[in-house]
From Swiss-Prot:
It is a multi-pass membrane protein. It comes from Ralstonia pickettii (strain 12J). Its main location: membrane. Its EC number is 7.1.1.-. NDH-1 is composed of 14 different subunits. Subunits NuoA, H, J, K, L, M, N constitute the membrane sector of the complex. This is NADH-quinone oxidoreductase subunit H. One of its GO terms (cellular component) is plasma membrane. It is an enzyme of class 7 (translocase). It catalyses: a quinone + NADH + 5 H(+)(in) = a quinol + NAD(+) + 4 H(+)(out). The keyword Oxidoreductase does not apply. Keywords: Cell inner membrane, Cell membrane, Membrane, NAD, Quinone, Translocase, Transmembrane, Transmembrane helix, Ubiquinone. Coiled coil: none annotated. One of its GO terms (molecular function) is oxidoreductase activity, acting on NAD(P)H, quinone or similar compound as acceptor.
């Protein structure tokens, strides 16, 4: 099918076809992503309601299914008020600087074999680079707002993101060591080889099992990176109201909100790709092989997003010093230690990744 589309596009658009095809694939990711964010918020409210033994949204549409549409319309109709004391240029560009990296990172995430916007060999390096850019938008928002609450939230966010990116980086290096490739498709394919995969039990050959500490560190660090509960001291309502977003309203505020939920989906998709076999089914059986790989990736992402929500419903917010201690004194030594263990494992006779 892809070959037919490529042939038709080349004949129709000529030399412009590569650019047109890239734009089409980008739109095919961005539009469903926006819909996913809307209904992820509904799922979050429904699941937390169920955990709290209440109904959650149930008034707009059947079973509250139109609640996200109502929320979007509400934000679109709200006036974007720019306070007089802000630095206007930085104030306006900050939400875009937070949102753009969250969307750009989807360019290299494989939905199934050869199904991605850009299949670059340095995909893992691209992920590490792009994921670090969002913090600049947060710092700009805090500085430009000319508010002590916004500035304090921005400083917390920058320190927290930098602290946990180190542990996440070490986890990614470990994945690179055992797979020998920076290409995300190669990383998925490498997880579906070996003894257990040869016997049809793919789930036991995925990276989560031999790299279990890295799997836990990467996902928990991802929760901290996205400033989600219990690491949401950046916008701690009882301390600094909304943190770096306090002076934003309407669609400007919605862009920050959108970026947060897109980043949740990004972390879940990357965790599924790097540690949970990506688009592969857990069991190599005829009854499961007919299901498209894209569907398996969606299931894994959905389950990981539900863990995000469960953490919010179950745990109290940590103090800021506890969050810093977890990142610097526990996660970084743990990842460095396991990095050494994996390095020794790779050169030993018991190397399971040969």
């Amino acid at each position: 099918m892809i070959e037919s589309i490529t042939s038709f596009g080349t004949a129709t658009f000529g030399g412009w076809w590569p650019l047109v095809w890239t734009l089409v694939r980008a739109v095919c990711i961005i539009l469903p992503l926006l819909l996913c964010v809307a209904y992820l918020i509904l799922w979050e409210r429904k699941l937390i309601g169920w955990m709290h033994v209440r109904l959650g949204p149930n008034r707009v549409g059947p079973m509250g299914l139109l609640q996200p549409i109502a929320d979007v319309l509400k934000l679109l109709l709200k006036e974007v008020m720019v306070p007089s004391a802000v630095s206007r240029g930085m104030y306006i560009i900050a939400p875009l600087m937070v949102l753009m990296p969250a969307v750009a990172i989807w360019a290299v995430i494989p939905f199934q074999a050869e199904a991605m916007v850009s299949n670059i060999n340095a995909g893992l390096l691209y992920v590490m680079a792009i994921s670090s850019v969002g913090v600049y938008g947060v710092i700009l928002a805090g500085w430009a707002s000319n508010s002590k609450y916004a500035f304090l939230g921005a400083m917390r966010a920058s320190a927290q993101m930098i602290s946990y990116e180190i542990a996440m980086g070490f986890a990614l290096v470990t994945v690179l060591m055992v797979t020998g490739s920076l290409n995300l498709s190669d990383i998925v394919n490498s997880q579906n080889r070996g003894f257990f995969a040869g016997h049809g039990i793919n789930i036991l050959s995925w990276n989560w099992l031999p790299l279990l500490p890295m799997f836990g560190v990467y996902f928990i660090s991802g929760v901290a990176e996205t400033n989600r509960h219990p690491f949401d001291v950046v916008e701690g309502e009882s301390e600094i109201v909304a943190g770096h977003m306090i002076e934003y309203s309407g669609m400007a505020f919605a862009l920050f909100f959108l970026a947060e939920y897109i980043n949740m989906i990004v972390i879940s998709a990357l965790t599924a790709t790097l540690f949970l076999g990506g688009w592969a089914s857990p069991i190599d059986a005829p009854v499961l092989n007919w299901i498209p790989g894209f569907f398996w990736l969606l299931i894994k992402v959905f389950l990981l997003l539900s863990v995000f929500i469960w953490l919010r419903a179950s745990f109290p917010r940590y103090r800021y010093d506890q969050i810093m201690r977890l990142g610097w004194k526990i996660f970084i030594p743990l990842t460095v230690g396991w990095l050494v263990v994996v390095a020794i494992w790779l050169v030993s006779p018991w190397n399971i990744w040969k």
